[in-house]
């Protein structure tokens, strides 16, 4: 019966003993020695080849056999030979990828490892970001399997790699060393600017510096993440700076003209211009993320969620957040953003509505009705409903128990701060197909 081996590209090929003999002979010649047939036979007697064995496994056995026969210099030469060929293959694969990427019809088609990334354009920036992804995948898998072996043993570590390769699971941040996503508190930025996270801007002092500084802060944080950056306090802080300039009752005078320039803008127009500056800036691709836009999340609250999270919150001047004006601002932003999306494609922010429930219904009827109204108008956002305001969700899957800070991300302290690393997605379709094919119950 003919024996087949598995090549590096996954194809099967008939096993050839002559190829191994030639490789061993070349290794001896490279160190100025000569391998007789008896020597080669003794070495090969230690190599076991079975049907379906990989090329790498055969070569590993040859290395061990050379060491066992005490041909240490030859074994070293053989190892170096394998390493050079590995490097040559990697360079060849990179060149092949370059050609295929240039010929691809779009960035998703050209992406070999991360086709679902937040990339819209195929250009040099996205190409540069794609090239090292295969190396990051190998590094991430090595670090994680080493940790799995340490905790659970080799069998589970091997099973993890098998499930990845067979597409039963997908690891969201394998192509980067960065954490996947984070929900951050903005308070360190409010009192110290971006200096604590590597920037050089000072704390915001007015509405204009808040808008520009907020965009810079989100870009800096997002450059250190491979996924989303959530800012649950965004509108609360913006509301504070609007109140500093126009008074906490500004929402009652939204039609009042406050701009003495030729534009004669009202308070409402000033606010929507700030919305426009922030949202359109953050939706632009950035070089720090390989020409991807920042993945940005925000949160809205009903009165009870707000009071639970920020009831004891104080701004640097000692003032407390004002719910009435914030409630108006949240609604204004949702209305504006929903209408703006009819004019152009705006992916971010991803919005989450946090509603407290009681006896199976929303506790804050006003915000329950407004949520239904926004859905009726075609707005797209997440809704997180909980009977305990001790829990907060900042995006589609990220949930934080505020009373338990054991799972708290280090960019900030408090109920809104949390994060994730090594996020796994289960491929249910693949699991069901496998179960049906093998007559298993799923």
Predicted regions and their residues:
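Conserved catalytic cores of very large enzyme subunits
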Residues: 88, 94-442
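Charged, amphipathic alpha-helical regulatory modules used
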Residues: 1-102, 107
């Amino acid at each position: 019966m003919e024996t087949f081996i598995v090549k590096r590209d996954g194809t099967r090929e008939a096993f050839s003993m002559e190829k191994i003999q030639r490789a061993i002979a070349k290794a001896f010649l490279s160190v100025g020695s000569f391998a007789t047939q008896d020597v080669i036979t003794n070495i090969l007697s230690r190599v076991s080849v079975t049907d379906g064995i990989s090329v790498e496994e055969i070569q590993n056995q040859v290395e061990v056999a050379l060491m066992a026969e005490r041909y240490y210099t030859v074994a070293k030469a053989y190892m170096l030979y394998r390493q050079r060929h590995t490097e040559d293959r990697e360079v060849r694969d990179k060149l092949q990828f370059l050609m295929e990427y240039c010929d691809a019809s779009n960035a998703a088609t050209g992406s070999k490892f991360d086709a679902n990334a937040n990339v819209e354009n195929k250009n040099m920036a996205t190409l540069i970001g794609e090239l090292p992804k295969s190396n990051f995948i190998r590094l991430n898998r090595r670090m994680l399997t080493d940790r799995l072996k340490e905790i659970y043993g080799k069998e589970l570590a091997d099973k993890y790699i098998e499930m990845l390769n067979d597409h039963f699971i997908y690891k969201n941040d394998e192509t980067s060393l960065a954490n996947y996503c984070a929900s951050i508190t903005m308070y360190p930025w409010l009192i110290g600017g971006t200096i604590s996270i590597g920037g050089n801007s000072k704390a915001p002092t007015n509405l204009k510096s808040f808008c520009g500084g907020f965009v810079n802060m989100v870009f800096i944080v997002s450059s250190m993440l491979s996924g989303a950056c959530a800012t649950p306090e965004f509108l609360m802080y913006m509301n504070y700076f609007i109140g500093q300039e126009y008074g906490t009752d500004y929402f009652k005078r939204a039609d009042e003209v406050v701009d003495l320039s030729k534009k004669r803008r009202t308070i409402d127009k000033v606010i929507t211009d700030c919305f426009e500056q922030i949202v359109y800036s953050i939706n632009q691709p950035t070089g720090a993320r390989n020409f991807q836009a920042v993945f940005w999340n925000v949160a809205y609250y009903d009165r009870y969620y707000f009071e639970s999270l920020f009831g004891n919150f104080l701004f640097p001047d000692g003032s407390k957040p004002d719910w009435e004006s914030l409630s108006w601002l949240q609604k204004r932003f949702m209305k504006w953003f929903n209408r703006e999306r009819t004019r152009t494609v705006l992916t971010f922010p991803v919005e989450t509505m946090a509603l407290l429930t009681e006896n199976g219904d929303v506790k804050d009827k006003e915000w329950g009705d407004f949520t239904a109204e926004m859905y009726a108008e075609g707005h797209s956002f997440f809704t997180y409903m909980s009977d305990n305001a001790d829990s907060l969700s900042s995006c589609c899957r990220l949930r934080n128990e505020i009373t338990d800070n054991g799972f708290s991300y280090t960019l900030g302290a408090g109920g809104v701060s949390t994060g994730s690393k090594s996020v796994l997605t289960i491929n249910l379709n693949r699991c069901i197909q496998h179960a049906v094919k093998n007559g298993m119950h799923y």
